[in-house]
Amino acid sequence: MIRISLDLMGGDFGPQVVIPGAAKALDRHPDISFVFYGLKEQCDPFLAKFPKLKEKSVFHDCELAVSMEEKPSQALRRGRYVSTMWRSIEAVKTGDADVAVSAGNTGALMAMAKFCLRTMANIERPAIAAIWPTLKGESIVLDVGATIGADAQQLMDFALMGGAMARALFEIERPTIGLLNVGVEEVKGQEEVKEAGRLLREANIDSLEYSGFVEGNDLGKGTVDVVVTEGFSGNIALKTAEGTAKQIAEYLRAAMSRTLLARIGYLFAKSAFDMLREKLDPSKVNGGVFLGLNGIVIKSHGGANAEGIAAAIEVGYDMAKNGLNQKIENDLKKYHAKRLPPIGPEAA
C-alpha cells in the first residue's frame, strides 16, 4: 500500500478539482491510500460524491490554507505547523505518508519542504524535476526553478538525482545524461557547465551514462533520458514549452473552425487531431518532483484539472513504489565515497 498525503486546498480550484483527481488515481491504483489535509466545510461536499475514495482516506481538518499569492517567507511564518500544505509535507517526515502532493504555491511548497524535511546528506540545493514529452516518449529535465545559478558540483548532483529518478520512473538500468548548453562543443558555454561536464566525464558512474552537452532543440527530440541545467534556464525552457504547446493548440483550433471545408476536413482527421491534442495536453505529464530532500514531494501545476491532479499523484505513486530516495541516496554515497581521500593504511 502506497500512502499519499494530499493538500486538498492547493491550486487554482482546490477541493473541487483535487478530490476528483484523487478519485481517478485511486481507480487506476487500488493500492493507494490517502491522508487528506483540508478545510472541512469546503471539502465535505466534494468528498461526499466519492464514497469509495472516502473509505480509502483519512481526513484531517486544518486551520488554514496557503494562497497562491503568498510569498514563501510569509507562508512559512503563517502556515507552519497549521496549514494544509505544511501538514501534508509533515506527514512524510513522521512516516504517516510515503509521498506528499500539492498543487499549491511553488515557492511556499519548496520553502516548507526544505524547512520540514531538510536536504539529503551531500546535497547543497534541491532541484525540481519535470517530466518532458518527447518524440521518443518522455525524458526528465531538472532543475526547472528551485536553484538559480547552480555551480558545477550542484549540476553534478542534479545529474545523479535525475538519473535515479529516470531509473525509478522509466525503469531503465543506465539512463543517458546531457548538460543543457549553448552548443555541443566542449569549449562552449559557461565555466560552471564546462566544469560539470568534466566532473561527469571523470566520475565513471555505473548508474548513468554521460552523453555530453545538448542544446535546446534536443529537449523535444528525446536525445537523452535526463537533461540537466540550473533553475533559471530550466524554468524558462519549461514555460516556453508550455506556452508553445498552447499556441499550437490555439492555431489548430482557429484553422479547423475557419471555414466549412476546414470543419469537414477536421471530421475526417478527428482521430489524428485528438492524438495531437493529447500530446500537447500538459495535464498528461503533470507533476514536478522535488529532488534532494529527505522525503518525496510532488508539485502539481496550479491550474491542473482533475486528470492533471491524477497524473501528479501517479508520479508520486511511481516514485514511492520504485524507491526513488533510496536510489538517490545510494548513488550519492557511491559518488562522494570516491571523492573522499583515503584514510588509514590506504593513505600511505
UniProtKB/Swiss-Prot annotation:
Superkingdom in the source lineage: Bacteria
One Pfam family from the record: FA_synthesis
Lipid biosynthesis found in the keyword field: yes
KW Chloroplast (keyword) present: no
Single GO molecular function: phosphate:acyl-[acyl carrier protein] acyltransferase activity
Reactions this protein catalyses: a fatty acyl-[ACP] + phosphate = an acyl phosphate + holo-[ACP]
InterPro entries: FA_synthesis (IPR003664), Phospholipid_synth_PlsX-like (IPR012281)
GO biological process, any: phospholipid biosynthetic process
Compartments where located: Cytoplasm
Pathway: Lipid metabolism; phospholipid metabolism
GO terms for cellular component: cytoplasm
Keyword set, alphabetical order: Cytoplasm, Lipid biosynthesis, Lipid metabolism, Phospholipid biosynthesis, Phospholipid metabolism, Transferase
Main localisation: cytoplasm
EC number: 2.3.1.274
Subunit structure of this chain's protein: Homodimer. Probably interacts with PlsY.
HAMAP family: PlsX
Function, as annotated: Catalyzes the reversible formation of acyl-phosphate (acyl-PO(4)) from acyl-[acyl-carrier-protein] (acyl-ACP). This enzyme utilizes acyl-ACP as fatty acyl donor, but not acyl-CoA.
Family of this protein: Belongs to the PlsX family.
Protein name: Phosphate acyltransferase
Organism classification: Bacteria, Pseudomonadati, Pseudomonadota, Alphaproteobacteria, Hyphomicrobiales
